[in-house]
Amino acid sequence: MTTLLMLYPAYGTVSCHEVCRHAEQIDGLRVVLADDSPTTSDLDIFDEVWELPPPENVKDAYALLRRWCEKRPADGLFLQSERGILLGSLMVRDLDLKGPSVEAAHLCSNKYLQRVALQKAGIGVPMFSLAEDEADVHRLAAQFGFPVLLKCVISTMSRLVTLISADDQVDASVARMREALKKSLDVKRLVSFSETGDVDLGCDPTRQFLVESFLKGDMIETDGFVVGDKPFTFGVTEQIQSIDPPFFIESYLLPSECTDNEAIETVSDATIRAMGLSDSAFSTEMRTLDGQTSIVEVNGRLGWDEGFSELFKVRTKQERILQAQQLALGYEMRLERDHSRCAALAYRSCYYNGIVEEIPTAAELNGLRTETLQLGLATHRGARFLAPPDPEVYPHVAWALATHPTSSHAANEIARTALERLQIMISRI
């Protein structure tokens, strides 16, 4: 029987159970969960459950996985979470399995070395440099021009990203960043990966951080799979981001109607090659202005925003989580792009400290569904929302996916209207 090991698979509202459910479509498959917080219900869903240390403890988790896999070898590793890709790449190397190499996983996680590699390949990136104190940021801001961004070296899912618009904001912003780095589990995970795999990080993420110029232009991304070393892109997706607070996604529009999408996909393919990524999913965020495209970041995994599977299925007609499992096992994948419908995935969000008091029931949401509209929740009654700049902020409350025969922007209007009609109450605290 073929064994698929799922490593820290859950993210946000995507549960371990949902990821496992798709694997049930693969005949003769034994599914093993390796996670830091397995539940009793996991024992009923998975064929076997291994309890790992938290993801930031790569050293001990790696040692446990090595011992377990020596006794019960895996035929594939599902490495589609930020928490799992670094550790998983070490296991891919040791077990000679399909998946991202250690070097590629590192470049997709270490945003400093990622920018170095992209710049070397002639691909556009923001102006960037490492900093570790207020003096560095004042100097770099004078060089780059305001606004500038402060970012943790490792990908943090939009956490620890600070926009600085003026010189008098620098000192307080740097102080917050330095304090946050001391507590960051993402930083601990990167350092533990470096020590375990003998990987040179090119910097000290416990005290250094990125300072970047702020990229202007249309906000877009590409998502897809790298099969072997060949990228397959679902399409070019336009992002609509929040303004105050900035950087949170309000809508995804597929396809983008504001860009030369063929040229964008050419840049995306070159970016994947520069990362050396293979046999994995990818998500690449970009800015394009006056025909010039620059990379904001590259991730060597699936994007996990609520509704993403439904959004991309409009174009590919396939379930991407199942495809990622097939890819990990080296199975043939069905790859296609259907251009007959445009789509938009919109979110209703909460940007203040609050407690969810009232949300629609599943039956109420199902009653609103139509052939061209789907809705879902990203939270539950009693859940607490945090206000930015709290590093644990996650603002999505509900999502809506709408399709339209000719326009993703028209689909977005339909989705946003549906979201505003939902009866949701979040009390401020």
Predicted regions and their residues:
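Conserved ATP-binding module of the ATP-grasp superfamily
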Residues: G124-P126, P147-L150, D167-K216, P245-F247, ...
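ATP-binding N-terminal substructure of ATP-dependent carboxylate-amine bond-forming enzymes
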Residues: M1-A104, A135, F385-L386, E392, ...
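Peripheral (often C-terminal) accessory segments that flank ATP-dependent C-N-forming ligase machineries
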Residues: L5, K120, Q325-I429
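Glycine-/Pro-rich loop/turn segments that contact NAD(P) or position catalytic residues
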Residues: H106-G124, D133
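A short beta-strand motif that forms the metal-chelation/ATP-contact edge
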Residues: S89, Q292-L302
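Short, well-ordered beta-strand elements within core beta-sheets of diverse protein domains
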Residues: T162, E212-S213, S256, H396-P405
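Short beta-strand-to-turn element immediately C-terminal to the catalytic PLP-Schiff-base lysine
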Residues: A131, V161-A166, F225-V227
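ATP-dependent carboxylate/phosphate-activation module, predominantly the ATP-grasp catalytic core
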Residues: D168, V174-M177, S213-L277, A281, ...
